Amino acid sequence: MSIRSWPAAERPRERLLELGAASLSDAELLAIFLRTGVAGKSAVDLARHLLNQFDGLRSLLDADQPAFTAQLGLGPAKFAQLQAVMEMARRHMAESLRRDSALENPAQVRNYLKAQLRHEPHEVFACLFLDNKHRVMTFEILFRGTINASYVHPRQVVKRALAHNAASLILCHNHPSGITTPSRSDIDLTKRLKEALKLVDVHVLDHVIVGDGEPLSMVEKGLM
């Protein structure tokens, strides 16, 4: 049955306009994004099928292009549309951070870093560079691969901090395993970077580790 034949109060788009996006299920939100279904399936039916295939919304949103476009009802145009929506969401968060001090809203900072790094299939190390009022200047990925004290070069981090004229920064990297517990190498690396950046009067405010669930703040865990 086509969604158009449903009572207005049950249609996802009408429900969103009346009740707000937060009131909709994952399937209803995805159905609005899909707009149309396929033969024998309404957009909501197709959305439920896709969520089942990917075992949830997160895996669907994180899927690469081959995995995404291999599914019924999806294609390159939908993949491009989804990537554009997600990038706009990341930029919206970045603009909010540029207006306020990162210290005043640490949860927002962690959510932004999670949005930047959660989808990365391999370990990456990045910095969030801040001005003298702790407002975000820019986010930059510096290293890809195994993140440890021998792979991440302090001189490169210092070089980028000086290039951005940053007064402080937040270190961050992801754990593709999903477990955010810092390793001994993570702790040692943080110490080395703090010492190197202190020499050029750039302060390390935190080191955030992104995995499944909430990102971990090494400051809040007393590890810095």
Curated annotation (Swiss-Prot):
<dbReference type="GO" id="GO:0008237">
    <property type="term" value="F:metallopeptidase activity"/>
</dbReference>
<protein>
    <recommendedName>
        <fullName>UPF0758 protein PSPTO_0086</fullName>
    </recommendedName>
</protein>
<dbReference type="InterPro" id="IPR010994">
    <property type="entry name" value="RuvA_2-like"/>
</dbReference>
<keyword id="KW-0862">Zinc</keyword>
<dbReference type="InterPro" id="IPR025657">
    <property type="entry name" value="RadC_JAB"/>
</dbReference>
<keyword id="KW-0482">Metalloprotease</keyword>
<keyword id="KW-0645">Protease</keyword>
<feature type="binding site">
    <location>
        <position position="186"/>
    </location>
    <ligand>
        <name>Zn(2+)</name>
    </ligand>
</feature>
<feature type="short sequence motif" description="JAMM motif">
    <location>
        <begin position="173"/>
        <end position="186"/>
    </location>
</feature>
<dbReference type="Pfam" id="PF04002">
    <property type="entry name" value="RadC"/>
</dbReference>
<dbReference type="InterPro" id="IPR001405">
    <property type="entry name" value="UPF0758"/>
</dbReference>
<keyword id="KW-0479">Metal-binding</keyword>
<comment type="similarity">
    <text>Belongs to the UPF0758 family.</text>
</comment>
<dbReference type="InterPro" id="IPR020891">
    <property type="entry name" value="UPF0758_CS"/>
</dbReference>
<dbReference type="Pfam" id="PF20582">
    <property type="entry name" value="UPF0758_N"/>
</dbReference>
<dbReference type="InterPro" id="IPR046778">
    <property type="entry name" value="UPF0758_N"/>
</dbReference>
<keyword id="KW-0378">Hydrolase</keyword>
<dbReference type="GO" id="GO:0046872">
    <property type="term" value="F:metal ion binding"/>
</dbReference>
<feature type="binding site">
    <location>
        <position position="173"/>
    </location>
    <ligand>
        <name>Zn(2+)</name>
    </ligand>
</feature>
<dbReference type="InterPro" id="IPR037518">
    <property type="entry name" value="MPN"/>
</dbReference>
<feature type="domain" description="MPN">
    <location>
        <begin position="102"/>
        <end position="224"/>
    </location>
</feature>
<feature type="binding site">
    <location>
        <position position="175"/>
    </location>
    <ligand>
        <name>Zn(2+)</name>
    </ligand>
</feature>
<dbReference type="GO" id="GO:0006508">
    <property type="term" value="P:proteolysis"/>
</dbReference>
